[in-house]
């Protein structure tokens, strides 16, 4: 199974540790798929600063194909993070994606050929690839992480091109998850999965709804657990074509991620000059 993730990357800076960790939804899924034993590639835009150099080195160490990555002059994406007593992530602020916010990926013929050689493409709401989805879904099936974006206009725009739709839904009741799945299916998504933190996950395959409880873990840090769930599900389902099995693998992968800082480790000591603001926003 060959997975390609396209889009966002970031480093998550932990104020209390004065350390940043590689991350970003698309990059996390690429690395975690590789760790699960599958061929993996990543295409995205990085800067030319210390954070970008660390990301590129990590991709090399993890043996994720980064041959088609774009590097531009400017700062890499950085999110400033602290943790609460439960190990949940609280974002303090960010640089809005850094250089990624001022550029966009333009797919050339060689990119299209490279992407076509994979079995599945994963991207996210943070990757700004909505206009490219009609082309991409014609190459390989598309997985899309909507995070908490459930706006009807956005679902109508994206879902027609998506095979696997993932939502962060820890604030939703079970009935609200059902309504969201119904809407996403109505606009074209084939499978719709809502991850709900400690409440586990709900997946709708259209004709059947599946429930997956969490796998108990000693929690150090929950950052990246949702991305790990996605990587675990996609790789397992593409190999076995068994939803129940894939959900269990996803939950186990997410549990392991909760036992390390960052999505998959690789902390890099770094002193942020301004230290960030004190305003905090909890990410569900």
From Swiss-Prot:
Record carries keyword ATP-binding: yes
Annotated function: Catalyzes the phosphorylation of a range of fructosamines to fructosamine 6-phosphates.
Top EC category: transferase
Matching Gene3D superfamilies: 3.40.1190.20
Similarity section: Belongs to the carbohydrate kinase PfkB family.
CDD domains for the chain: Fructoselysine_kinase_like (cd01940)
Highest rank taxon of the organism: Bacteria
Single GO term (MF): kinase activity
SUPFAM superfamilies: Ribokinase-like (SSF53613)
EC number: 2.7.1.-
Protein's name in the database: Fructosamine kinase FrlD
PANTHER family the record matches: FRUCTOSELYSINE 6-KINASE (PTHR43085:SF41), HEXOKINASE FAMILY MEMBER (PTHR43085)
Gene: frlD
Keywords: ATP-binding, Carbohydrate metabolism, Kinase, Nucleotide-binding, Transferase
PROSITE patterns: PFKB_KINASES_2 (PS00584)
Pfam annotation, one family: PfkB
């Amino acid at each position: 199974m060959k997975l390609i993730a396209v889009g966002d990357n970031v480093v998550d800076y932990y104020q209390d540790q004065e350390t940043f960790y590689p991350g970003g939804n698309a990059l996390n899924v690429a690395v975690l798929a590789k760790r699960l034993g599958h061929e993996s590639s990543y295409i995205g835009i990085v800067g030319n600063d210390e954070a970008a150099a660390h990301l590129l080195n990590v991709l090399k160490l993890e043996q994720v194909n980064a041959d088609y990555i774009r590097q531009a002059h400017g700062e890499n994406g950085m999110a400033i993070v602290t943790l609460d007593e439960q190990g949940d992530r609280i974002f303090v602020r960010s640089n809005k994606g850094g250089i990624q916010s001022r550029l966009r990926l333009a797919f050339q013929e060689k990119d299209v050929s490279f992407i076509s050689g994979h079995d599945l493409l994963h991207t996210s709401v943070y990757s700004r690839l909505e206009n490219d989805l009609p082309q991409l879904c014609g190459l390989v099936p598309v997985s899309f992480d909507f995070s908490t974006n459930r706006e009807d206009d956005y679902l109508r725009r994206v879902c027609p091109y998506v095979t696997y739709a993932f939502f962060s839904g820890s604030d939703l009741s079970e009935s609200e998850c059902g309504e969201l799945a119904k809407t996403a299916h109505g606009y074209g998504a084939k499978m719709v999965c809502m991850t709900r933190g400690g409440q586990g996950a709900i997946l709708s395959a259209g004709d059947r709804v599946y429930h997956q409880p969490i796998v108990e873990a000693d929690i150090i840090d929950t950052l990246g657990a949702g991305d790990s769930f996605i990587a675990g599900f996609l790789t397992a389902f593409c190999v076995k074509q068994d939803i129940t099995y894939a959900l269990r693998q996803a939950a186990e992968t997410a549990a392991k991620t909760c036992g390390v800082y960052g999505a998959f480790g690789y902390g890099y000591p770094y002193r942020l000059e301004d230290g960030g603001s004190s305003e905090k926003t909890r990410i569900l």
